[in-house]
Amino acid sequence: MKNGRGNRVAVVGTGFVGASYAFALMNQGIADEIVLIDANENKAEGDAMDLNHGKVFAPKPADIWHGDYDDCRDADLVVICAGANQKPGETRLDLVDKNIAIFRSIVESVMASGFQGLFLVATNPVDILTYATWKFSSLPQERVIGSGTILDTARFRFLLGDYFAVAPTNVHAYIIGEHGDTELPVWSQADIGGVPIRKLVESKGEEAQKELERIFVNVRDAAYQIIEKKGATYYGIAMGLARVTRAILHHENAILTVSAYLDGPYGERDVYIGVPAVINRNGIREVIEIELDEEEKKWFHRSAATLKGVLARYFAQ
């Protein structure tokens, strides 16, 4: 165990996502200390060695070591990447039975260390497992965050930017709802340079509208395509996790589409779901309730109902 100085991030699960996330943290100089925890201690130790050998190339070298749950005591943030991976043909919700028991063990072990920081959950189905983390930890809702639709939103902005030939950073558009098959695009609030995207395609005819629909389908189904081609997704979500981590540790008050607990916003209660939220060192400062059109409201409620239906099998609602 290192002597805690500066910001400490504990990464639980050093598979594809966890290791890629630690690599992103190192390359961006986000954390001062990174501890890697995995049931396979040799894997965690090997990753720590590998990352340490690249310290000289990092913008802000971090202390990196493989550890155990006791190291979570002084962590500012515990990021859970452990669990069963999604296989070809599986939906994210198919993973619940496999991962819920794993999460109970992980969260209880973290809390037993005396941990008083924030949880960030990456494992799928992320909305369900973020709710489980909140329940198992008994922490305030704002201190438990899921990666939500941060990657879906990034995919959306990338594909829209590609279609309109502008930088994705200049595309303002959100994917909200379940990180999964019932997620939805908020077309009513999407714009590029202040011009609504719906207005941009008005003059281009029906084919342009169909292309927007195809873009959303490609966003929604991207994970299935990547899993089919290479077995897993990890680079994109690792960078998304790093972005959330920076917002937390650097107290940025950044608006990101994370899995946040709703207790009234969007007309929903007692569910973690992907929505824009203000993120800082205290966790979720507030949920941003963007104005949805009637069709989007119906779609969002269907998405929330899907998640609640799964939660009801494991937690009293």
UniProtKB/Swiss-Prot annotation:
Reactions the enzyme catalyzes: (S)-lactate + NAD(+) = pyruvate + NADH + H(+)
E.C. designation(s): 1.1.1.27
A Pfam family assignment: Ldh_1_C
Cell compartment(s), UniProt: Cytoplasm
A GO cellular-component term linked to this record: cytoplasm
UniProt record, GO biological process: glycolytic process; lactate metabolic process
Source species, domain of life: Bacteria
Catalytic residues (UniProt): 179 (proton acceptor)
InterPro entries registered for this protein in UniProt: L-lactate/malate_DH, L-lactate_DH, L-lactate_DH_AS, Lactate/malate_DH_C, Lactate/malate_DH_N, Lactate_DH/Glyco_Ohase_4_C, NAD(P)-bd_dom_sf
Binding site for substrate: 86, 92, 124-127, 152-155, 233
Phosphotyrosine modification, residue list: 224
Keywords assigned by UniProt, alphabetized: Allosteric enzyme, Cytoplasm, NAD, Oxidoreductase, Phosphoprotein
Enzyme class: oxidoreductase
Pathway assigned in UniProt: Fermentation; pyruvate fermentation to lactate; (S)-lactate from pyruvate: step 1/1
Residues that hold NAD(+) according to the record: 17, 38, 43, 69, 83-84, 105, 122-124, 147
Sequence positions that bind beta-D-fructose 1,6-bisphosphate: 157, 172
GO molecular function: L-lactate dehydrogenase activity
Activity regulation (record text): Allosterically activated by fructose 1,6-bisphosphate (FBP).
Main localization (coarse): cytoplasm
Function: Catalyzes the conversion of lactate to pyruvate.
Family: Belongs to the LDH/MDH superfamily. LDH family.
Oligomer and partners: Homotetramer.
Protein name: L-lactate dehydrogenase
Organism this protein belongs to: Bacillus caldotenax
